[in-house]
Design a protein with these regions (language model features):
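Periplasmic-binding protein-like
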Residues: 101, 118, 181-185, 190-193, ...
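Mature extracytoplasmic/periplasmic domains
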Residues: 254-314
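Sec/Tat signal peptide C-region and signal peptidase I cleavage site
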Residues: 15-19
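Early extracytoplasmic/lumenal segment of secretory-pathway proteins
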Residues: 20-84, 337
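Bacterial N-terminal signal peptides
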Residues: 4-14
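Extracytoplasmic ligand-binding site segments that recognize negatively charged/polar headgroups
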Residues: 27, 31, 70-207, 221-222
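Residues embedded in well-ordered beta-strands
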Residues: 23, 121-123, 255-257
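Extracellular/periplasmic bilobal clamshell ligand-binding domains
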Residues: 299-337
Length: 337
């Protein structure tokens, strides 16, 4: 009887410990995320174990572990990365609770949901480019001869660039995109290199007239979190949102989904619902300078200055993943290193 009782206690405490944790696989690298995860722990009593790595590394680990995986939630930057994980059947469907219904349909599907937004836009040097000459610019205009040797942008293997080109493919078709890319690469001011902030620095220094970069990098630079030099550089450039006269600016997401073999699916669902509360959205966005995925969220003054623009909502962000391989192939063919 005593042995049976001890076995029961052992099973009880093992079960209790198991159900009171969450194993989060994330490619996001913001210290502020960890602070938010602590708040979730305090509110729910669910311990969050964070496994941080690049999306492809996380994807490979989950595939290698298969049904033995203890991963509960996969939280990744870029819809293309989420689509890749979905294609490999790493997710299970979530329950669409009230909070998840607040996310626009174009920013989620049955397996993952957008948590934050960012726009990939153009930054210009006002000492080199007149606002009136650029105020109505589109992504398509970046291939114009007037921008020869003027544009700073990252390499073709960058997923943000691949998603942008994927959106052009979806809107304009392969023939147009192929010709557009051939002209675009002639307008690069230098060999593509560095991160998004490096592109903005190039414009601030006068090396380039235009840069293509994500909005939150600009916010980070303006905030001073990346040092005084980068803050001063960001103050020298101006943001411009393309395609405001037609479809709107290209928008992408960070998003999360519940993993197929999650041992803690209820905790995983609760965690995703928590990320979509106004409190969590405020903390996420005011720290990372991304845009909230839901409405009526209080944001800081840096975000407030750039958050009112027309978004491209006529395209499902999952399309970026579907088109990325094709986009990358065309980018390389055009000579985009």
């Amino acid at each position: 009887m005593r042995i049976v009782f001890l076995i029961f206690l052992s099973l009880f405490f093992t079960s209790y410990s198991y159900s009171s944790e969450l194993n989060l696989f994330t490619s996001r690298h913001y210290p502020s995320d960890l602070i938010l995860f602590k708040k979730f722990e305090e509110k729910t009593g669910i311990k969050v174990n964070v496994i941080n790595a690049k999306s492809k590394v996380l994807e490979k680990r989950l595939l290698d572990e298969g049904s033995k995986s203890k991963g509960d939630v996969l939280f990744l930057a870029d819809a293309g990365a989420l689509y890749s994980a979905e294609e490999k059947k790493l997710f299970t469907k979530y329950n669409e609770s009230q909070s998840l219904r607040l996310v626009p349909k174009s920013l989620k599907n049955d397996y993952w949901v957008g948590i934050t937004k960012r726009a990939r836009i153009i930054f210009y040097n006002p000492n080199l480019v007149d606002y009136n000459d650029i105020k109505n610019i589109s992504y398509e205009d970046l291939s114009d001869e007037r921008w020869t040797k003027s544009i700073a942008i990252r390499q073709s293997n960058n997923i943000y660039n691949q998603s942008l080109v994927a959106s052009i493919l979806e809107h304009r078709g392969e023939n147009f995109t192929t010709k557009w890319l051939e002209k675009l690469v002639k307008n690069f001011s230098r060999k593509p290199q560095g991160n998004d902030r490096a592109q903005i620095l190039s414009v601030a220094a006068g090396e380039s007239k235009l840069a293509v970069a994500n909005t939150y990098y600009y916010g980070l630079m303006l905030s001073g979190k990346k040092g005084d030099e980068q803050k001063k550089a960001a103050q020298k450039v101006k943001p411009i949102f393309p395609n405001q006269n037609d479809r709107g600016a290209h928008v992408n997401i960070s998003g999360a989904g519940i993993l197929k073999f999650s041992p803690n699916k209820k905790n995983a669902q609760s965690f995703i619902e928590f990320l979509l509360t106004k409190e969590a959205q405020t903390n996420l966005c005011n720290s990372s300078f991304e845009f909230p995925i839901i409405e009526n969220v209080s944001t800081n003054k840096i975000i407030n200055k750039i958050k009112n623009f027309k978004e491209d909502i006529n395209i499902d962000v999952s399309t970026y993943g579907k088109r990325q391989a094709q986009a990358f192939k065309l980018m390389k063919k055009a000579g985009w290193n």
